[in-house]
A protein has these predicted regions:
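PAPS-dependent sulfotransferase catalytic core
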Residues: 1-80, 234-238
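Short His-Asn-centered micro-motif
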Residues: 7-8, 98-103, 123-124, 204
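Glycine-rich phosphate-binding loop used to anchor ATP phosphates in small-molecule kinases
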Residues: 76-107
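Short, hinge-like loop/turn segments at secondary-structure boundaries
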Residues: 47-49, 136-140, 218-220
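Short aromatic-enriched loop/helix-cap "lid" or pocket-rim segments at secondary-structure transitions
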Residues: 110, 131-136, 141-145, 213-215
Length: 264
């Protein structure tokens, strides 16, 4: 029996791998939304807020996650996770798993609770990732302290802020900064966590451009045959066709790690 989970930010193309696993007879729980997220999510959301209390914001774009790796995991947290995953964990299926983007926000304790399961880290170019809204755009909703978007713009990118003279443009710019901060934070929390025994990184773009080769990697990793799903090539590189800012320099480290081009 194998248990699988996906680690990846919302709007990161994670529905593609969830739908792939479902098409491959992997039980992903029920009910699911159209993105393949296990519902209801409230217990997971509360677990995110609980873990966030033990993350120390050091100011600017720095957080200290170190105590998450050694402190006792609160019973309240494990109870919330077991509540959320009840149908998956008690299912008799040979292969099963779950997907919800908020798993990334609790990754350090999920790894400690489930050290032997198979993790798929699903990443997407943040320049595409920040173009559309997701529930995790404002990390304060999940208890995470991070810089104020407008203050950050004023100090680091004053020209961008000054150019946003229309209210709607300014609002969209602020949300893109929040999404970029969310991507950056989630990259940081995963990077700071000791990796489990079973860990693979897959880029959404590689899945779209060469599904066959990417599925071959995943099949070798998971040890099961995987079905194909329909993908749309236009989901890659949308930032080239989008108006407004899609890159902030604090994203550079994460982008380089995953092999994404840095704009000049």
């Amino acid at each position: 029996m194998s248990l699988i989970t996906i680690v990846g930010r919302g709007h990161g193309g994670t529905r593609a791998i969830s739908h792939t696993l479902i098409a491959s007879n992997v039980y992903m729980g029920e009910p699911l939304n159209r993105s393949g997220d296990l519902l209801p999510p409230q217990a997971m959301y509360e677990a995110c807020r609980l873990l966030a209390r033990s993350v120390l914001w050091q100011g600017d774009l720095r957080w200290d996650f170190s105590q998450l790796h050694t402190m006792p995991i609160p019973t309240e947290f494990t109870d919330l996770i077991h509540t959320y995953l009840h149908k998956v964990l008690t299912a008799p299926d040979e292969h099963k798993g779950w997907k919800i983007p908020e798993t990334t926000l609790v990754f350090p304790w999920i790894v400690r609770m489930f050290p032997e399961i198979k993790y798929i880290h699903w990443v997407r170019n943040p320049r595409d990732n920040i173009l559309a809204r997701h529930l995790t755009d404002d990390l304060k909703d999940f208890g995470v302290t991070y810089p104020d978007a407008e203050t950050l713009l004023a100090s680091r990118y004053p020209a961008l802020l000054a150019a946003a003279t229309v209210a709607e443009d300014k609002e969209e710019l602020l949300w893109r900064v929040r999404r970029a901060l969310s991507w950056h934070y989630q990259h940081a929390i995963v990077a700071a966590t000791p990796k489990p025994a079973h860990w693979i990184v897959v880029r959404f773009e590689d899945f779209v451009r060469d599904q066959t080769a990417t599925l071959a990697r995943l099949e070798e990793y998971l040890g099961i045959p995987l079905g194909r799903i329909v993908v749309r090539s236009e989901t890659v590189g949308r930032y080239d066709r989008a108006e407004g800012a899609s890159y902030f320099d604090f994203l550079e480290e994460g982008m380089r790690e995953f092999g994404y081009a840095i704009p000049s």
